[in-house]
Amino acid sequence: VLSSQDKANVKAVWEHVKGHEEVYGAEALHRAFVCDPQTQTYFAGKDLKENSAYLHGHGKKVMSALTNAVAHIDDIEGSMSKLSDKHAHELMVDPGNFDILAHHILTTMAMFMPQCLTSANHRSVDKFLSTVKHVLTSKYR
């Protein structure tokens, strides 16, 4: 459960993410695809090279969805309901991949904005990403 301090920390960190969703998202996805190649399973036939338009476009979608979740941090479940349905019923993504991607998102944030990712902010963002993962997997059965 995100405390009021966690929510404030996440919002503060996300002010530095806004406007960089494409770059951060592409970096996080690229790291996931290289370090954890099993994550490529859902992207057959897609150009997953580091500078590909597809990777940048999908990275922007991922991080923009998280930006939206931050904007609705008091109702993450409601704001991500359609995305949860899509991942559970249409895409059938292995829920373990959300853990992998969350790790690479945190790594990317630490790389691009180390001054923002203090230990307290790191903890809060990690809790936020865990909340998002829980919401995204809540409709799996």
UniProtKB/Swiss-Prot annotation:
GO biological process: hydrogen peroxide catabolic process
Binding-site positions, heme b: H87
Stored Gene3D superfamilies: Globins
Alphabetical keyword list: Heme, Iron, Metal-binding, Oxygen transport, Transport
Amino-acid positions noted as binding O2 in the UniProt annotation, renumbered to this chain: H58
Tissue expr: Red blood cells.
Residue ranges annotated for the Globin domain, each copy included: 1-141
GO molecular function, one term: heme binding
Any one Gene Ontology cellular component term annotated for this protein: haptoglobin-hemoglobin complex
InterPro entries linked to this entry: Globin (IPR000971), Globin-like_sf (IPR009050), Globin/Proto (IPR012292), Hemoglobin_a-typ (IPR002338), Hemoglobin_oxygen_transport (IPR050056), Hemoglobin_pi (IPR002339)
PROSITE patterns assigned to the protein according to its UniProt record, in alphabetical order: GLOBIN
Family membership: Belongs to the globin family.
Function: Involved in oxygen transport from the lung to the various peripheral tissues.
Subunit structure as annotated in this protein's UniProt entry: Minor hemoglobin is a heterotetramer of two alpha-2 chains and two beta-2 chains.
Identification of the protein by name: Hemoglobin subunit alpha-2
